[in-house]
């Protein structure tokens, strides 16, 4: 049997490569609803199966857990089948958002075959995420935060903006595992967000709590104090979970930032493939857009406006400046960046010649590779010597005068009026 997975050791396991963060968090939430809890072996088998399933990503766009379950081999180890069964049931319970009816004029309706009138715009639905659900009949599992838990959560949301799908899914997963009180949620907010975001969230939360208290909440007693005070009681499980939902909903009401978002400055490189550029845009929008904001119109607009000039010309020529993303990808899939690297042409070496070299008279090498100096074509024009070039002529070298003997130099320093003594025959002066 596998070892029971410790929730406090690693609240959020790493997703497999190629799977979006909000999809991976759906799998984690479904795994944590298993009774008994998942083991490390179950997570290992889940990641192993998803790596295989990502090779045939027909179940991702849109997400279809029933189709994914059909790819699971029979008798697959672990509890992957149970996790997929929970996801299928949850996806069936979430009602799909109906498309808005097309606007019609009260006087006359235009015919459907009129090519001058464009079809009505249908707002794309936001990616479905699982709500926070606790196992049925499970006792309260409230546990206060530890520093390692807060650090792990902050590491996961470090690249995501407050209110984005990845941010919200990570927070939902943490709320599901720890079942925090109002005080715990306030500590988490101050640890993750800046003081400005925390202040705006506090204002939105106060307005939502006022509406909920006016509307009436199950098991809420106004005489026992405000909802925030009653939610701090670990025994008030129902009120605590109502407060958790209001705390999460306050992120969706945060006003947008006045500065340009980070994803607006993502540009396609001169030699970057178009599909890689669109993938970077998609990840940045997942991490930066508030939850519930339509992503497809922004993605289609940036996929054209921030592309390089060559891809923009291709999209303009085919009329896909604001087409569906699949048409834009197909239009640019044949484009390849120009390879500007120089290719060195290596010529094969010729075999050594059998004839002797005309410089040294030896065979086995070419004259350009000969180590002997090249003989002059004629005699030196200065000295008429045929053995050297003009640049090596000794007449061009400056003559260095020979130094005088030291004795002569000393004699020159003597005064001229001193007579030299003469020795006599007898040796006397």
Curated annotation (Swiss-Prot):
The record marks 130-131, 344-345 as: Cleavage. One of its GO terms (cellular component) is viral nucleocapsid. The modification Phosphoserine is found at residue 105. It comes from the Viruses. A motif (PPXY motif) lies at residues 118-121. A motif (PTAP/PSAP motif) lies at residues 124-127. Pfam families: Gag_p19, Gag_p24, Gag_p24_C, zf-CCHC. Keywords: Capsid protein, Disulfide bond, Host-virus interaction, Lipoprotein, Metal-binding, Myristate, Phosphoprotein, Repeat, Ubl conjugation, Viral nucleoprotein, Virion, Zinc, Zinc-finger. Signal peptide: none annotated. GO terms for biological process: viral translational frameshifting. GO terms for molecular function: nucleic acid binding; structural molecule activity; zinc ion binding. Residues 93-143 are annotated as: Disordered. InterPro entries: D_retro_matrix, Gag_p24_C, Primate_lentivir_Gag_pol-like, Retrov_capsid_C, Retrov_capsid_N, Retrovr_matrix, Znf_CCHC, Znf_CCHC_sf. A lipid is attached at residue 2 (N-myristoyl glycine). A zinc finger (CCHC-type) spans 355-372, 378-395. HTLV-1 lineages are divided in four clades, A (Cosmopolitan), B (Central African group), C (Melanesian group) and D (New Central African group). This is Gag polyprotein. It comes from Human T-cell leukemia virus 1 (strain Japan MT-2 subtype A) (HTLV-1). The gene is gag.
